A protein has these predicted regions:
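Feature detects amphipathic, helix-rich regulatory segments
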Residues: 1-153
């Protein structure tokens, strides 16, 4: 059983410190394959999406996107987290209030996303992953960052 979170994307539901409220009948649950993008249609505008590092199942409330040729799935996973994309997702979501906003796939498909060629997508993803790794490392070891006062003129 997998879950989609805002901060961590697709994770094993067992890794979350939540009560399992899933149905005992999983026949309507959706299959996710490693490399698919899964998103929570009611929270896409908040960034509840991610590339799945696992194969498994998710709640029927989630939407699964299977990548096609010439698409680097992680490129779009990063793009889906950008503020400009979140704004578009909010704009295209349907519902009266933020509690009921919903972005189903037919509407998501209408949103224009710009993507360079596949090689550029790969380069961009590599750079962003290195930045993520550096940021995570610095957050784990804040003592490595020292603020030095500016020398007097």
């Amino acid at each position: 059983m997998l879950s989609v979170t805002i901060n961590d994307g697709v994770v094993k539901a067992s890794s979350l410190k939540r009560k399992d409220n899933s149905s005992s009948d999983k026949s309507n649950y959706k299959l996710v394959r490693k490399g698919d993008i899964a998103y929570n249609s009611m929270r896409m505008w908040q960034g509840a999406s991610g590339t799945s590092p696992y194969s498994g199942i998710v709640s029927p409330a989630y939407t699964i996107i299977t990548p096609i040729n010439n698409i680097v799935v992680d490129f779009f996973a990063y793009q889906f987290k950008m503020k400009s994309s979140l704004y578009k997702f909010q704009k295209y979501s349907q519902g009266l209030t933020s509690d009921t906003w919903n972005l189903k796939f037919p509407l998501l498909r209408e949103i224009k996303m710009i993507a360079p060629n596949k090689n550029e997508q790969i380069k961009i993803v590599c750079l962003l992953k290195k930045l993520d790794s550096t940021i995570a490392s610095n957050q784990r070891h804040p003592f490595l960052l020292k603020i030095r006062p500016r020398p007097p003129p």
